[in-house]
């Protein structure tokens, strides 16, 4: 049992020769995989260079996964959404206020088509090894996610499309209070868009590998995120996903939290014959003592995690979300990557 993949995310796609230099630096940091964060703008504007960048990564020996970063604000990420800019409709709607929100409703045919076209076009053109589904989520609630916060009351989505589907399926108007039917409806619809697109990608090329990365929450009696992907069994059981991954945990959260999330991630993945993946926070914040990075990697390793991921290249250096000592953080993560990836060979 050992860690077989070490990934880092990479954005600001543009010039192949610049990406190539960055890929060399990733190799020097023990990375086996680059997760290309392809924004809606990149897709719209830089598309000719995306396959060339993938080719450069392959030439250097990196595996490449494509992350439709922040698409429609359905996935996690800071990027702005062209879909939201170009469409005033097809947005998630607050159950309590009826307001349309700056999040695409991924249950609408319009956004589903947009998402599928984005991914299938890249599956055909880019020549990458697979896709990374990055923190898919409903806009609300998330207050449930906090281990200190209380339960949120508002939720999404009560747009005309969701309300119509709900009525058709359950035979009554979608309530404003989140009952069990609403919970099931939200989860079922949320899974559909990812499964449908994954299936179509694999039909195009069966070798394409899909990682589904959901929020790392306790999902306990007291704390449930209700973002649509809380039932890890449902997600990990999907035949269209190859890797079950759970997101970054902030360095200052208790050790026990890291341990519980990791145990449950590995257990869910193994139960359904999937690879497991856990993440390191390589931007924004850093541990007070960098040795905590070593200890966390050791914990992941000891609990049987198959793959490690880090967000993001160079600790976010140069961005508003850079870690205070971004380059040192990146180096320490790199040292850990090099240590673990040498094992089991
Ligand atoms: Zn909706």
List each model region and its residues.
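Aromatic-lined substrate-binding rim segments of carbohydrate-active enzymes
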Residues: 22-23, 35-86, 185-204
